């Protein structure tokens, strides 16, 4: 739980006691497709970029590929693999697949993948996320944006490469904020 993981047990306890609030009770308010749409809208408002789903080879039918476009020009791409399944490593993370760099053939655009282990959809019902999972998604997407929006062409320091361990968390924690912002929650 968000509060408990940050040493805010008293806040969590108060939520439960005063409001009978639980993560499970919030799930109907956070269907995964709407969360993604809201996340992409927030990113558009913050950075002026569009996120467009594209056809691409994927390793599992749950995985999807998207590109970031700035005024119609592709600046990077990413894969989302959001749902838990048999044999998949647990946890949530972002990894760079390809970094931005200049090559003899021109600019190589960055690509990353973001992996989570949310409860998958059942039948034709959308997957429902807890608010903690929404925060996790925003956090990992912050890492992804850090990787994809770099304008540095030196692969050794592009994106998250060469960034101190504490500073590498800044963009991801910045994105977490938007999972709490009232105006942003209206988009979710």
Where are the regions that the model predicts?
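Gly/Pro-rich turn-and-neighbor structural signature
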Residues: 10-90, 94, 164, 168
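Active-site recognition of the HExxH zinc-binding catalytic motif
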Residues: 132-147, 172
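Acidic/histidine-rich catalytic neighborhood
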Residues: 6, 74, 150-188
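Active-site-adjacent "gating/activation" loops or surface patches in catalytic cores
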Residues: 59-60, 67-135
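Single conserved hydrophobic/aromatic residue that forms the stacking wall/gate
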Residues: 1-12
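Short alpha-helical functional segments enriched in proximate histidine and acidic residues
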Residues: 2, 42, 46, 144-148
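Glycine- and acidic
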Residues: 19-29, 51-54, 113-135, 150-161
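A generic "alpha-helical surface" signal
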Residues: 2, 34, 132-136
């Amino acid at each position: 739980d968000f509060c408990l993981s940050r040493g805010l047990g008293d806040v969590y306890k108060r939520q439960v006691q005063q409001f009978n609030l639980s993560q499970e009770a919030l799930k109907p308010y956070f269907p995964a497709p709407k969360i993604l749409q809201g996340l992409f809208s927030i990113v558009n408002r913050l950075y002026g970029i569009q996120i467009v789903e594209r056809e691409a080879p994927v390793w599992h039918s749950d995985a999807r590929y998207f590109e970031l476009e700035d005024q119609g020009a592709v600046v990077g791409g990413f894969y989302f693999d959001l749902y838990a399944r048999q044999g998949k490593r647990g946890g949530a993370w972002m990894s760079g697949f390809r970094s931005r760099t200049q090559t003899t053939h021109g600019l190589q655009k960055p690509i990353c993948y973001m992996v989570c282990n949310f409860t998958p959809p059942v039948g034709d019902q959308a997957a429902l996320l807890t608010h903690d999972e929404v925060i996790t998604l925003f956090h990992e997407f912050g890492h992804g944006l850090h990787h994809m929006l770099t304008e540095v062409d030196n692969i050794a320091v592009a994106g998250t490469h060469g960034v101190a361990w504490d500073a590498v968390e800044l963009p991801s924690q910045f994105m977490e904020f938007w999972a709490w912002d009232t105006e942003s929650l209206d988009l979710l």
